[in-house]
């Protein structure tokens, strides 16, 4: 048996009083974060040692809450977790994995807070979620989680002023039996910039271009936003409309990728792909930056990885410099002229095979290389 953590996101429909509490908590969390960041910077200037997260928490309880009594009106775990998040940022900086923590801005920073489960203070009901201080908040519940152990909850206000809560559950389940890789339970996928992927079986995932579909409406709303006075009520109203379109696009994309990755994980145990640098490929120099960002291929691979591992399989990544598009899958001949990406079909001068589809051939080669890495081929 193994323990794993899994988060489930629920849409919240708070009443006016609960919204006020959430807003107050967001503000207090931001205030404590900025105050402790200021304390740490002041200690650094005075050549004093760095405060640990426990010392920062004591400082908050003994000093900040005494001076600013309104901090006691919100969930204490929210303030503690804000301090822990600040310490995490410092530790990342010390390990050269991130930059120095920055002060949180009221209008630009993400509005969220995290609270911990203790004494049944968090509960998922049939049509509500109970949260500390807020009580029962109306929610959209789609999964039965009564048998799962709750660890924490993160309340977030989206840019379009909708609310959601991400609840972290601890799941105890049997360790998946590792499946032996074979030719039949393995598939190769080649990245397709104007879709999603092409498989070695010839299946093409023509993912809808959700961003392009909403581009005209988004541009119209952004033009209206540009003409508003920054900081005015109408500016923030229009900003909410723009954010709603972005969230709709993101939800469409995520829904499609979940369905596509689940279908593949149910049919195959091992999926072979190229280890591409999606961030570099989205640069303007390639000429297809928007298409690359729109299809969310990196997110798709992340989904595939954990879904395959849950079933005893795995995602196999082939080296990005492997010339999958240049090698004839029938005879192994490497054709250098295929460095020209405009060539979509070609004839092999070595074995005589004609009308070879570039993408399907690449997917077949990726599968063969993946099987070799798995010790099958």
Description of each model-found segment:
Residues 1-79:
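Gly/serine-rich nucleotide phosphate-binding loop at the start of the catalytic core
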Residues 37-44, 90, 94-101, 171, ...:
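Long, hydrophobic, amphipathic alpha-helical segments used as structural scaffolds
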């Amino acid at each position: 048996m193994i323990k794993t953590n899994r988060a489930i996101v629920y849409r919240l429909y708070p009443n006016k009083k609960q919204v006020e509490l959430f807003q107050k908590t967001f503000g207090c969390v931001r205030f404590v974060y900025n105050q402790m960041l200021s304390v740490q910077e002041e200690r650094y200037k005075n050549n004093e040692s760095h405060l640990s997260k426990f010392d920062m928490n004591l400082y908050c309880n003994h000093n900040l809450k005494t001076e600013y009594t309104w901090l006691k009106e919100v969930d204490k775990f929210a303030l503690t977790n804000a301090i822990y998040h600040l310490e995490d940022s410092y530790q990342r900086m010390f390990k050269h994995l991130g930059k120095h923590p920055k002060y949180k801005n009221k209008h630009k920073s993400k509005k969220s807070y995290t609270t911990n489960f203790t004494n049944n203070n968090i509960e998922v009901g049939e049509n509500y979620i109970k949260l500390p201080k807020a009580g029962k908040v109306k929610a959209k519940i789609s999964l039965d989680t009564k048998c799962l152990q709750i660890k924490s909850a993160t309340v977030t206000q989206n840019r379009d002023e909708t609310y959601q809560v991400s609840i972290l559950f601890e799941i105890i389940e049997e360790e998946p039996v590792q499946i032996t890789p074979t030719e039949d339970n393995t598939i190769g996928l080649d990245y397709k910039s104007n879709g999603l992927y092409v498989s070695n079986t010839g299946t093409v995932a023509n993912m809808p271009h959700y961003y392009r579909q909403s581009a005209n409406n988004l541009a119209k709303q952004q033009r209206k936003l540009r003409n508003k006075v920054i900081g005015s009520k109408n500016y923030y109203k229009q900003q909410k409309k723009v954010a709603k379109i972005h969230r709709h696009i993101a939800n469409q994309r995520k829904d499609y990728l979940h369905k596509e990755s689940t279908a593949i994980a149910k049919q195959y145990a091992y999926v072979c792909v190229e280890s591409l640098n999606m961030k570099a490929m989205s640069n303007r120099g390639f000429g297809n930056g928007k298409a690359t960002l729109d299809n969310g291929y990196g997110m798709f691979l992340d989904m595939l990885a954990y879904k395959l591992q849950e079933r005893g399989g795995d995602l196999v990544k082939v080296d990005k410099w492997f010339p999958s598009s240049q090698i004839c899958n029938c005879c192994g001949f490497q054709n250098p002229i295929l460095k020209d990406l405009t060539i979509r079909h070609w004839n092999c001068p070595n074995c005589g095979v004609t009308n070879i589809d570039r993408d399907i051939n690449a997917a077949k080669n990726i599968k063969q290389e993946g099987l070799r890495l798995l010790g099958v081929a």
